[in-house]
């Protein structure tokens, strides 16, 4: 209990050190800050715990979730004071998308999974499918799944046909509308969120003696730009913008989106995390109608056939990036 208490205090201290500002985002890329405080474009992929990939050969995928946002809301704010005067500005952006039915989303998820397995196999990995994993580690079959098409942090979550949907850290949290990288309480919640699949995946891998992989793909209908949130800009402007296009969404730090987690068989619970930081966006047309409805700035109606084609294209570009990370650190 004492150790647990110390860990919680440490997490709280770390969370409190996260700046209470939202980073500037440009076309889906969250800008980071360099050594001197200047804004810099992040690398395509952030990888933590690279050493965990070493020696990987026989692997199993415990979680493969594809999330489809149905709406997005961003807020940009700035405020400041000088000479006794105070200024503030705010910009709100709300978008929605309809027109893509469940069957289309299921096909996209199915194809994404098949593509990922094929890419792993081509890269020299032996992929243990879910039924065999349950035989090797019976506990896997006892996990409590969520209903397919459940609503989570990034909209509608879909598992490939024949697989179960399991929550991953942050999936049930509400997104921060400011696009913040993140506020302290959100940071603490993310770090202490331990769904069953996340907590038990390393043990299942240990019992089955396979490396274990968990993937979350976020397939959005556009990318966003925001000036973020700042309390240091007197007379500053706030802006938020939207560029349509089927996209494998990126994230950064705690506000991550498309990710891959990996644990080697004898990981001791220490694994690797790869986070996509540069989105993969298609310029292919997919919108049949676009308008403004009430408080919504962009109400998009998608052509499901065109959306599916564009989604397959960007997924086929995004997934190899994760396989490459695994190979580069093998």
Predicted regions and their residues:
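N-terminal signal peptide c-region/cleavage motif recognized by signal peptidases
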Residues: 17-19
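Bacterial N-terminal signal peptides that target proteins for export
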Residues: 1-8
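A structural "domain/chain start" motif
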Residues: 23-128, 132-170, 174, 182-247, ...
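Hydrophobic helical h-region of N-terminal Sec-dependent signal peptides
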Residues: 9-15
């Amino acid at each position: 209990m004492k150790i647990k208490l110390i860990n919680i205090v440490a997490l709280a201290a770390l969370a409190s050190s996260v700046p209470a500002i939202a980073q500037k985002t440009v076309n889906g890329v969250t800008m980071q800050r360099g050594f001197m405080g200047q804004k810099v474009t992040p690398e395509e992929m952030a990888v933590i715990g690279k050493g965990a990939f070493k020696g990987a050969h026989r692997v199993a995928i415990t979680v493969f979730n594809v999330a489809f946002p149905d709406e997005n809301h961003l807020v940009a704010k700035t405020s400041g004071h000088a000479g006794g005067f105070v200024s503030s500005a705010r910009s709100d952006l709300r978008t929605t998308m309809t027109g893509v039915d469940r069957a289309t989303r299921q096909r996209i998820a199915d194809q994404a999974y098949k593509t990922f397995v094929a890419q792993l196999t081509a890269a020299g990995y032996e992929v243990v499918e879910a039924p065999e994993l349950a035989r090797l580690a019976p506990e896997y079959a006892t996990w409590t799944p969520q209903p397919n098409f459940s609503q989570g942090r990034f909209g509608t979550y879909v598992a490939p046909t024949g697989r179960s949907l399991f929550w991953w850290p942050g999936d049930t949290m509400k997104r921060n509308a400011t696009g913040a990288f993140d506020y302290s309480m959100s940071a603490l919640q993310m770090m202490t969120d331990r769904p069953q699949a996340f907590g038990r995946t390393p043990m299942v891998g240990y019992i089955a003696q396979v490396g274990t992989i968990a993937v979350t793909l976020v397939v959005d209908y556009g990318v966003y730009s925001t000036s973020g949130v700042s309390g240091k800009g007197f007379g500053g402007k706030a802006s938020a913008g939207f560029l349509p296009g089927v996209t494998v969404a990126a994230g950064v730090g705690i506000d991550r989106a498309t990710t891959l987690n990996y644990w080697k068989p004898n990981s001791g619970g220490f694994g690797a995390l790869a986070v996509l930081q540069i989105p993969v966006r298609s310029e292919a047309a997919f919108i049949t109608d676009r308008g403004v409805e009430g408080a919504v700035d962009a109400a998009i109606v998608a052509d499901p056939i065109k959306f599916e084609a564009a989604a397959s294209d960007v997924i086929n570009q995004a997934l190899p990036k994760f396989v490459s990370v695994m190979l580069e650190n093998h």
